[in-house]
């Protein structure tokens, strides 16, 4: 599944999908996003934001963490049913369906912190994979530096799509990706996501994850 190239067109393709794996220590981006929220829970789970912050900071006894979001279902009784939609981290760039053990441990961890009238249900979140094709336009003088510029652009795109920088229900907006890419890579004259024209929206329990990344190069 590559791309045809000619003398003035170059493409690189990267499949970012993997099957399984662990994870490193909590990233700086993840800490910035969730640590202040978790601190504000004061070790009690009352609001949906409390549940979300707790689940996103939770680590199983085998060191696995994930991404989560929370919604509430109003029951006919006085109890609220809190749905925790979770995905387990397979690596620093990939999420997967959470294992039963991970979900069991997460549910058990909420028991002593939730309100007595709340019922917590741990549910599978959904991953929506996305292939991205980006064409970058460079000045002719950078032809000899093409490989380095492609690699630098790739790092910028992967960082933008990193799971620590995305969340449930967040759309993919190609214009936002290009804006960040051009801010990061000042030697790129012009860039375009050529296979996605409009923002891609997802449901509240879905998260967009990069699958294949291809970078093509034009010269002027």
Predicted features, each with a name:
Residues 123, 148-220:
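An aromatic-glycine-centered, glycine-rich loop/turn in mixed alpha/beta architecture
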Residues 42-173:
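Carbohydrate-recognition loop of C-type lectin domains
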Residues 3, 8, 85, 133, ...:
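Intrinsic disorder/low-complexity detector
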Residues 19-20, 61-64, 201, 219:
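Intrinsically disordered, low-complexity segments enriched in small/polar residues
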Residues 1-53:
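Catalytic P-loop NTP-binding/switch module of NTPases
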Residues 23-30, 34, 127-144, 180-200:
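A broadly tuned preference for mixed-charge, low-complexity surface segments
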Residues 11-13, 68-70, 191, 215-217:
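Generic structural motif
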Residues 1-2, 8, 117-119, 169, ...:
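Glycine-centered loop/turn motifs
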């Amino acid at each position: 599944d590559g791309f045809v190239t000619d003398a003035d067109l170059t493409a690189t393709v990267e499949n970012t999908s993997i099957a399984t794996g662990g994870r490193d220590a909590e990233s700086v981006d993840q800490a910035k996003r969730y640590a202040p929220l978790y601190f504000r829970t004061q070790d009690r789970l009352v609001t949906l934001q409390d549940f979300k912050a707790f689940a996103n900071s939770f680590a199983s006894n085998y060191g696995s963490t994930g991404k989560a979001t929370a919604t509430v279902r109003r029951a006919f009784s006085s109890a609220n049913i809190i749905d925790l939609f979770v995905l387990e981290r397979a690596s620093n760039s990939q999420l997967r369906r959470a294992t039963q053990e991970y979900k069991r441990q997460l549910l058990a961890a909420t028991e002593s912190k939730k309100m007595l009238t709340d019922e917590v249900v741990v549910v599978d979140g959904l991953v929506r994979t996305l292939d991205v094709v980006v064409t970058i336009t460079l000045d002719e003088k950078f032809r000899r530096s093409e490989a380095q510029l492609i690699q630098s652009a790739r790092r910028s795109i992967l960082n933008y799509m990193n799971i620590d920088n995305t969340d449930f229900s967040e759309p993919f907006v190609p214009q936002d990706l290009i804006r960040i890419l051009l801010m990061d890579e000042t030697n790129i004259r012009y860039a375009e996501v050529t296979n996605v024209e409009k923002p891609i929206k997802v449901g509240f329990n879905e998260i967009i994850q990069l699958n294949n990344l291809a970078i093509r190069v034009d010269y002027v």
